[in-house]
């Protein structure tokens, strides 16, 4: 890939409908890899993302962001591809017609028609409710990373990070560079699970090196948040650590309990969902003809898996099956890593018991746990409490309820 050069931003025109051979939704690692794989075919390609620059969450730009070399190379290659148009800070508003979406940015709205579409819509954090989680000073673990990259001042602030998965260590590293004082990294997985995961990392040397670099003396297994304490803002965190309750004074708490695939657009387009992710075949093709998906909207495995899945989808979308097939062994390698990741960091059922009767589950509509516990499902809960009907449209509470109550989220309409 060539050296970094500035990328283009193709804005919308409210007076026209644009036509493309291939439309890619999402400009994270999977979306960029898909565009670059498809570009040599000469197809007219559009890639849209609601962020101001390509890279997704893992390669998010910002005043304090240090983009890795791979991110810079992919950005440069994307900018150099003359048949690829990037629509940054752009969102999908509606499905206007078959093979046609209505898009908008801050200035206008317009339609885009496509022959083939690749969904690279990524994932969002799973946030579970617990007493005090709405206090100022409490954020998601990934949310904290985004704030740090955006320049939020953390110098001297005491920070506790809790939840599950490698993102906790990555968030801690970012916060430490910004001047935060790490007090505890509370991982809910057991020591046995972490040991088994670590023993497998030799199969993926780059991941073993990364884990070694992120290792932190404040990391504890068998630990999870019980409550955030404070009156008007966060003052301390109560943790369960190996069965013992401890309290740690702090100014910030960042929690992340894994990821939830962003499947809403895929579902609205008629793509089948399985195991809470968009279902795909060996070619990354969805159940709907001429629709593909790649990256964490199809399951979680890190940027390496997202990149290879995106490339397979890009090649397959333009008929380059031979090149797509050549990447199958590489995908299998990273899928094996994803399997280990998801197995070893499976959530402890105790986390379902964190919320108390008056703990808010839906923050937008002020719906407490007690108003939901006796409901039979998601639709019943919405009818009786307006849960999930606020500004975030259930992106936070919907995933939490799915985990807490085993509800099935209905297909978006």
Q: Model-derived features: where do they sit?
A:
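FAD-binding core/adjacent interface of flavoenzyme oxidoreductases
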Residues: 3-8, 17-20, 71-158, 236-245, ...
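FAD-site-proximal beta/loop scaffold in flavoenzymes
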Residues: 140-148, 252-301
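A conserved FAD-binding loop/helix module that cradles the flavin
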Residues: 294-326
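Low-complexity, small/polar and acidic-rich linker and loop segments
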Residues: 403, 410-413
